[in-house]
Amino acid sequence: MNLLQKTRKINAMLQKAAGKPVNFKEMAETLCEVIEANVFVVSRRGKLLGFAIKQSIENERMKRMLEERQFPEEYTKKLFNITETSPNIDINSEYTAFPVENRDLFKTGLTTIVPINGGGERLGTLILSRLDREFNDDDLILAEYGATVVGMEILREKAEEIEEEARSKAVVQMAISSLSYSELEAIEHIFEELEGTEGLLVASKIADRVGITRSVIVNALRKLESAGVIESRSLGMKGTYIKVLNDKFLTELEKLKSS
């Protein structure tokens, strides 16, 4: 395959995604095929987002790293020193992707490191490794193209996370604002009693201790449940099982109590 055909192969993989999230494993496999190298897509914290192996490396530490999907912390931190594509790093470098304890087995091992940037910040690193053959300009063009695609995908995921967090917070705030003063007081006592995100409570006991009617507690729980903030289930004489579904709820409740 020439460079154009290889680029088209990456494009075909992207078009197949058709607006859906790009699978980092598929991206790594496509780059592995067109560049003919081992490919590792690593997050800024060393998490292995995707990888594909062209030449198997028989080393226990490497096998464990792939199973755990986590690069060593020290190595991950060092990667931040590389701010532009660094091709054909040999086995003696601290940046080599080959196991240094087996240098003799991988004397011809070469590593190429491509920073993944986006939105003005470092998002991760694309690491390529292979034996015997140097990475040429065509390989580097494909690697940098791949790193750009991965960077855009990481940014999209981050934007979705921020959006989801804002949505969760808004739902909680609306649910809490729908509670009357006595219902809010009841909810505060309920979650003091639970001491966590789920558990059993006996509504009548709380009602007696706080000095409110049981119906106030029932109404408060119903409002939170209809908003999707909690789920509750009656267990008869044992009481009511409650579980928090929205992780922003307890934080917002704590803010109200301390304000």
Curated annotation (Swiss-Prot):
Lineage: Bacteria, Bacillati, Bacillota, Bacilli, Bacillales
Family matches, as PANTHER family: GLOBAL TRANSCRIPTIONAL REGULATOR CODY (PTHR40062:SF1), GTP-SENSING TRANSCRIPTIONAL PLEIOTROPIC REPRESSOR CODY (PTHR40062)
Residue ranges of the annotated DNA-binding region, renumbered to this chain: 203-222
Stored NCBIfam families: codY_Gpos, PRK04158.1
Organism expressing this protein natively: Geobacillus sp. (strain WCH70)
Gene3D superfamilies the UniProt entry points to: 3.30.450.40, Winged helix-like DNA-binding domain superfamily/Winged helix DNA-binding domain (1.10.10.10)
Keywords, comma-separated and alphabetical: Cytoplasm, DNA-binding, Phosphoprotein, Repressor, Transcription, Transcription regulation
Official protein name in the record: Global transcriptional regulator CodY
Biological process according to GO: negative regulation of DNA-templated transcription
Cellular localisation: Cytoplasm
Region annotated GAF domain, chain positions: 1-155
A GO term from the CC aspect: cytoplasm
GO molecular function, a single term: DNA binding
Database matches in InterPro entries: CodY, GAF-like_dom_sf, GTP_trans_reg_CodY_C, Transc_reg_CodY_N, WH-like_DNA-bd_sf, WH_DNA-bd_sf
Family under the similarity heading: Belongs to the CodY family.
HAMAP family: HTH_type_CodY
Organism superkingdom: Bacteria
